[in-house]
A protein has these predicted regions:
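Glycine-rich nucleophile elbow surrounding the catalytic serine of serine-hydrolase chemistry
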Residues: 1-2
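Flexible "cap/lid" loop of the alpha/beta hydrolase fold
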Residues: 5, 12-52
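Active-site acidic short loop of glycosyltransferases
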Residues: 8-11, 119-120, 147
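Conserved hydrophobic packing residues within short motifs/helices of P-loop NTPase cores
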Residues: 15, 123-125, 151
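Conserved alpha/beta-hydrolase catalytic His-Asp/Glu region
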Residues: 26, 51-117
């Protein structure tokens, strides 16, 4: 998102999936560190010390727990799928990217009006049952990006591209077809 705002001339279109917007005073923060229901990994990421450890050592059980928290349909939270997620986390650069999202204040002092600067056609996809990023954050995109389509999927959590890949792919294809 930051790149889009800093380099609008390089962006032809934008697709945001389960994306956070900005912090708004009084709004529920789904990914709260203090939330007892949040996965252990999220709580560990709130500490500089444990972030450094997680850069080199990421236990598989954290991927399992994170997966269970991320999806709505718990039947999808299989060991095989958790293993795949763990393998993705171990890819070069993945841990650094994940940890950077939890380092410092991702939101800054920006207000939702900053999204009015986005001129590229934008598709926003969000699961209504997302436990990590409040689905209400998508309303900031809808209210402020001039050319935006927002798709909210019912009975879907934080990972619509895994929980309903066919629908997600169709919506992305349809979006791309409209901007050609």
């Amino acid at each position: 998102m930051r790149y889009t705002l800093q380099h609008p001339e390089q962006i032809n279109s934008l697709i945001l999936i389960a994306s956070s917007s900005v912090r708004v005073e009084g709004e529920k923060e789904a990914e709260s560190d203090e939330d007892e229901c949040s996965p252990l990994a999220w709580r560990l990421l709130s500490s500089n010390f444990t972030r450094k450890i997680l850069l080199v050592f990421t236990p598989k059980f954290l991927a399992e727990q994170g997966l269970k928290t991320s999806i709505y349909d718990q039947d999808l939270a299989t060991k095989e799928w958790a293993n795949e997620f763990h393998e993705l986390v171990l890819l070069e650069g993945s841990r650094e990217a994940i940890i950077s999202m939890f380092s410092g204040d991702r939101y800054g002092n920006e207000t939702p009006e900053i999204f009015k600067q986005i001129s590229a056609p934008t598709l926003v996809i969000h699961g209504e049952e997302d436990n990590l990023i409040d689905v209400e954050s998508s309303k900031h995109f809808e209210e402020n990006i001039p050319e935006v389509a927002v798709k909210i999927y019912s009975n879907i959590g934080h990972l619509p591209m895994y929980e309903d890949p066919e629908r997600t792919a169709k919506d992305i294809r349809d979006f791309i077809d409209t901007i050609r």
